[in-house]
């Protein structure tokens, strides 16, 4: 049994550990303290635009986040249901206390995972290969590969106004030694910042005039494989807005924000700004949305989504109590910003292995990303590829047309990050191919080939695929008169049901009911997938043609030891960027910032001449 070390037990570390254990490996899961496992220091939710699709992609490859979210959901929502299928997704409020308990139970019941408490102070090397770690500077752990998933704990500082603390999220202990080790061993570190909102005592809020934000019912699931539920009902969220009075107080007290006083040197997230950042950057907006979200059935706290802040607590007290329904609010925990070290991810291969040290992988916020889902997606890929590396197998590298996980990793390893990277649907060129409903079509076969998807799972998928294909053939063959379908005074021209379903106002279930077709052995998700496949056939084929036209560049591999200075007519900037990033193929090289078409032509010519 091969041995692996995972450093950090957050969303990335857990995904890496469980996928490695599923592949029959021994995993040492290192964490500062057992209570840090599966911590959710920011929003108590999983999913959202693009991110929710990542959670389903993880599930299709055999990962665990979808099961955890389904098993701990307090509210389930479909987002963007009125928009096109390329942007529809799931978002669940989760119980952050039970989410942690759920993962600890999974760890305790898994013979292949051993939880090791203590601070990892350095990575042990043999030449240029990682072989283990030191715990607390004294205990040596050895393994075939090491995966770093330290989140926001490296040299972290928290800020509320002028108050600065040498600590990790939620007052937890941070980790300082590993940052120094990375620096000494040639890694380029960057300083990033994120933040979290205040938590309010649930019973101190007046809900009487607040706009309720209900869920969409308890029969929604991230996972394709199980129908786990935490509760058979849903807790509501509430929507409120900031006021101009609040904006004025924030503007008048920007000098008391750690972000604007100069205390923080790290770069904050562009797409998840603090409330003071929103007021400054979007000064023309008279109000901003704030969501009141429950954190747990076991906690008396409500999360103020959209109200992240590093303002002094005296200012926080004022502006919180000016929010609708919060006049008598009791603050359980004040908002704060956190600054931390990360590595520049251009130092990684698309497999998430380090270019500097073999068998050393990185995943999650250490790579400059933000979000639980982004972290989990990287953890899964790092775990799979650490396994592949030790077993001398090809790494799993998902392309931009196969998965949002592929889009994210391609972005960060080719372009690096300057602020915490967040996945957005707009980052994907092929959104219609990367839908919420077709995740299994895209990825399950890869999971099965690697060994993370079981024979039972692939058989179930193939049964559904056969049912899908049969129904599509039936729709193509079945001709029905227009009068029968519309009951309108028109000529009774015969149309296939397939053609008729392409009309935007026609729903598949309504059509099947009309012709009295028994669809009871089709689940609703499969019917939705069939409907989208038919309605968007032309657009899907168009995107697929574009993808296929670019595949040629991906097939032209670039040797890792290629000396770019010897490639004729390459620009100096191109040589510098290519030496830094070391792309694996021409398609990856083309996506690097600063590489132009002339550089690609020169590189292609050189590779062909030296094939």
UniProtKB/Swiss-Prot annotation:
Cofactor(s) this protein requires: FAD
Keywords: Cytoplasm, FAD, Flavoprotein, NAD, tRNA processing
Chain sites annotated for binding NAD(+): 268-282
GO biological process annotation, one example: tRNA methylation
GO molecular function, one term: flavin adenine dinucleotide binding
The keyword Nucleotidyltransferase is annotated on this UniProt entry: no
Annotated residues for binding of FAD: 8-13, 120, 175, 365
GO cellular component: a single term: cytosol
Entry-linked InterPro entries: FAD/NAD-bd_sf, GIDA_C_N, MnmG, MnmG-rel, MnmG-rel_CS, MnmG_C, MnmG_C_subdom, MnmG_C_subdom_sf
Compartments where located: Cytoplasm
UniProt keyword tRNA processing, yes or no: yes
Name of a matching Pfam family: SAM_GIDA_C
Family statement: Belongs to the MnmG family.
The protein's role, per its UniProt record: NAD-binding protein involved in the addition of a carboxymethylaminomethyl (cmnm) group at the wobble position (U34) of certain tRNAs, forming tRNA-cmnm(5)s(2)U34.
Subunit text: Homodimer. Heterotetramer of two MnmE and two MnmG subunits.
Protein name per the record: tRNA uridine 5-carboxymethylaminomethyl modification enzyme MnmG
Taxonomic classification: Bacteria, Bacillati, Mycoplasmatota, Mycoplasmoidales, Mycoplasmoidaceae
Gene: mnmG
């Amino acid at each position: 049994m091969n041995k692996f070390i995972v450093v950090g037990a957050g969303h990335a570390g857990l995904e890496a550990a469980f996928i490695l254990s599923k592949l029959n490996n021994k995993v040492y899961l290192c964490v500062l303290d057992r209570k840090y496992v599966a911590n959710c220091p920011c929003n108590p939710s999983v999913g959202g635009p693009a991110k929710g699709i990542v959670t389903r992609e993880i599930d299709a490859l055999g990962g665990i986040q979808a099961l955890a979210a389904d098993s701990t959901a307090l509210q389930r929502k479909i987002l963007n249901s009125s928009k096109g299928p390329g942007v529809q997704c799931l978002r669940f409020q989760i119980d952050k206390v039970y989410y942690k308990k759920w993962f600890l139970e999974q760890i305790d019941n898994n013979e292949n995972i051993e939880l090791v408490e203590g601070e990892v102070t350095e990575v042990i090397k043999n030449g240029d290969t990682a072989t283990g770690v030191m715990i607390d500077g004294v205990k040596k752990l050895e393994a075939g590969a090491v995966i770093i998933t330290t989140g926001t704990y490296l040299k972290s500082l928290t800020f509320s106004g002028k108050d600065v603390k040498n600590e990790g999220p939620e007052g937890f202990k941070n980790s300082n030694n590993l940052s120094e080790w990375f620096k000494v061993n040639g890694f380029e570190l960057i300083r990033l910042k994120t933040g979290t909102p205040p938590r309010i005592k649930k019973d101190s809020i007046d809900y009487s005039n607040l706009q309720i934000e209900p869920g969409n019912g308890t029969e929604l699931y991230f996972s394709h494989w199980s129908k786990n539920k935490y509760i058979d009902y849903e807790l509501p969220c509430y929507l409120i807005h900031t006021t101009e009075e609040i904006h004025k107080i924030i503007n008048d007290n920007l000098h008391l924000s750690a972000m604007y006083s100069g205390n923080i040197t790290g770069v904050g997230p562009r797409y998840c700004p603090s409330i003071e950042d929103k007021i400054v950057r979007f000064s023309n907006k008279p109000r901003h949305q704030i969501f009141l979200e429950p954190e747990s059935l076991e906690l008396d706290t409500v999360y103020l989504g959209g109200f992240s802040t590093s303002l002094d607590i005296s200012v926080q007290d004022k502006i919180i109590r000016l929010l609708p329904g919060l006049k008598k609010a009791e603050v359980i925990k004040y908002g704060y910003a956190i600054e931390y070290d990360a590595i520049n991810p251009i130092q990684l291969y698309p497999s998430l292995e380090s270019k500097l040290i073999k068998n050393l992988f990185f995943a999650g916020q250490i790579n400059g990303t933000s979000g639980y889902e982004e972290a989990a997606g990287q953890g899964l890929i790092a775990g799979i590829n650490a396994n592949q590396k030790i077993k001398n197998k090809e790494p799993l590298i998902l392309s931009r047309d196969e998965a949002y996980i592929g889009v994210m990793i391609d972005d960060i390893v080719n372009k690096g990050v300057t602020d915490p990277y967040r996945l957005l649907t707009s980052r994907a060129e092929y959104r219609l191919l990367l839908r919420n409903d077709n995740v299994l079509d895209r990825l399950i076969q890869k999971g099965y080939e690697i060994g993370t998807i079981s024979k039972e799972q692939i058989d179930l998928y193939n049964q559904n695929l056969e049912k899908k294909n049969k129904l599509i053939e039936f729709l193509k063959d079945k001709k029905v008169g227009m009068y029968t379908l519309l009951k309108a005074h028109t000529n009774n021209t015969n149309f296939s049901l397939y053609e008729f379903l392409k009309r935007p106002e026609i729903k598949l279930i309504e059509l099947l009911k009309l012709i009295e077709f028994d669809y009871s052995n089709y689940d609703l998700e499969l019917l939705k997938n069939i409907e989208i496949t038919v309605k968007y056939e032309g657009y899907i084929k168009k995107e697929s043609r574009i993808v296929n036209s670019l595949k040629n560049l991906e097939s032209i591999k670039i040797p890792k030891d290629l000396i770019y200075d010897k490639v004729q007519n390459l620009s100096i900037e191109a040589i510098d960027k290519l030496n830094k990033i070391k792309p694996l193929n021409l398609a990856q090289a083309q996506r690097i910032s600063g590489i132009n078409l002339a550089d690609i032509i020169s590189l292609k010519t050189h590779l062909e001449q030296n094939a």
